[in-house]
């Protein structure tokens, strides 16, 4: 008897819940679009170019010097003394190795800084999305890249977020 009373009360309770009460308020946002258009991204690109400019110039100079020595070896190698040719070849091998190591280190540090700055911007965008969602009482916010289809009832908050991100 208690079981039937419980079931009956649950059925009555469920039927009294309106469909509006059961619906979640859902929004979508295009994170990649916001990231690509953010003014912070443009500032970071310029900042990183400035930060790595001297090292990039140094690498370009090293590469140019290597190319000049290679041309000298190719052009004059046949007429050089064996000792001179051998010393030039050793010098080239040594300079190539130094250049290769510096270029690899440069690429790794540049990539690391780009990743660090990208993550800062994405975290800031995520915070803005969270604030907009809370302010406008959204239950769920989904990135448009994760959605294959959405109806017109789903609100796109990309512009609201974009305005706050700048």
Curated annotation (Swiss-Prot):
One of its GO terms (biological process) is chaperone-mediated protein folding. Its main location: periplasm. It is found in: Periplasm. GO terms for molecular function: unfolded protein binding. Residues 102-113 are annotated as: Lipopolysaccharide binding. Residues 1-22 form the signal peptide. One of its GO terms (cellular component) is periplasmic space. The keyword Chaperone applies. InterPro entries: Chaperone_Skp, Skp_dom_sf. The keyword Signal applies. Keywords: Chaperone, Periplasm, Signal. Belongs to the Skp family. Molecular chaperone that interacts specifically with outer membrane proteins, thus maintaining the solubility of early folding intermediates during passage through the periplasm. Homotrimer. This is Chaperone protein Skp. It comes from Blochmanniella pennsylvanica (strain BPEN). The gene is skp.
């Amino acid at each position: 008897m208690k079981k039937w009373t419980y079931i009956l009360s649950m059925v009555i309770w469920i039927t009294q819940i309106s469909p509006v009460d059961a619906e979640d308020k859902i929004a979508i946002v295009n994170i990649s679009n916001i990231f690509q258009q953010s003014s912070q991204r443009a500032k970071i690109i310029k900042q990183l170019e400035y930060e790595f400019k001297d090292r990039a110039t140094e690498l370009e100079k090293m590469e140019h010097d290597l190319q000049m020595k290679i041309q000298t070896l190719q052009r004059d190698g046949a007429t050089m003394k064996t000792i001179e040719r051998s010393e030039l070849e050793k010098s080239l091998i040594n300079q190539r190795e130094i250049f290769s190591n510096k270029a690899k280190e440069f690429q790794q540090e540049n990539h690391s800084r780009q990743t660090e700055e990208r993550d800062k911007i994405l975290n800031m965008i995520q915070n803005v999305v969270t604030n907009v969602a809370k302010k406008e009482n959204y239950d769920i916010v989904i990135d448009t890249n994760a959605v294959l289809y959405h109806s017109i009832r789903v609100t796109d908050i990309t512009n609201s977020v974009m305005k706050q991100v700048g």
